A protein has these predicted regions:
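Small cysteine-rich, disulfide-bonded extracellular modules of the LU/uPAR three-finger superfamily
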Residues: 1-84, 88-127
Length: 127
């Protein structure tokens, strides 16, 4: 799978808009680090650290929404972080979408890697 919106989230959005099926969005979205593509279920290539980090987002504009905080991930082993999956729960829940890192970041145990920015875009938009 390429990075992107999960089947779960796509179906929830479409059912909500087109079928009037209620969808309750999560109060908080959580980020999980990965050493490669998280895959269709969001669970592949997971970092050795199981923690998911709370994310905050600015208001959507022009079909995009951007992260407004900077979660920090402390490595517990030597690894390279290449992507992030986003979830609706800190430990269980549903996989929402994944994003590829602009550049993979490598480090050793104790090093900190930050998510400086993440933007989810729905498009193309009608012009």
């Amino acid at each position: 799978m390429a990075y992107g919106v999960s089947v779960y989230l796509a179906n929830k959005i479409l059912d909500h808009i087109c079928r009037n099926v209620a969808y309750t969005p999560p109060a908080t979205v959580y980020a999980k680090m990965h050493t490669g593509d998280p895959g269709a279920a969001g669970t592949a290539n997971a970092s050795s650290v199981a923690t998911r980090y709370a994310c905050a987002f600015a208001a959507a504009a022009s079909g995009s929404i951007s992260q407004s905080n900077t979660p920090e991930h402390t490595l517990s082993a030597t690894e390279s972080i290449a992507g992030v999956s986003f979830w609706d729960h800190p430990t269980a829940g549903n996989f929402l979408w994944s994003s590829q890192a602009a550049a993979s970041k490598s480090g050793a145990s104790g090093d900190i890697i930050r998510i400086n920015t993440d933007t989810l875009t729905l498009g193309p938009l009608a012009a």
